[in-house]
């Protein structure tokens, strides 16, 4: 089962599969990321406490 990251972007609830996430970085207490949105680059952010473990693992690997 693939992990999904739920986040809000411009007031809209979104969800992205962790396998589509390309780049992850920390901004204060938020975890920001870019992901493949059907050929375009999508952006998202989630608070550190709401981030799934797999997303935090990607952050540590950089």
UniProtKB/Swiss-Prot annotation:
Temperature effects on activity: Hyperthermostable.
One Gene Ontology term, aspect cellular component: cytoplasm
InterPro entries: Chromo-like_dom_sf, DNA-bd_7a-e_arc
Activity-pH behavior: Highly stable from pH 0 to pH 12.
Keyword annotations: Cytoplasm, DNA-binding
Protein location: Cytoplasm
Molecular functions per Gene Ontology: DNA binding; RNA endonuclease activity
Cross-referenced Gene3D superfamilies: 2.40.50.40
Keyword Cytoplasm: yes
Key word Cytoplasm present: yes
Disulfide bonds: none
Family annotation (NCBIfam families): Sul7d
Assembly and binders: Monomer.
Function noted in UniProt: Can constrain negative DNA supercoils. May be involved in maintaining the integrity of the genome at high temperature.
Family, as annotated: Belongs to the 7 kDa DNA-binding/endoribonuclease P2 family.
Name of this chain's protein: DNA-binding protein 7b
Species whose genome carries this gene: Acidianus hospitalis (strain W1)
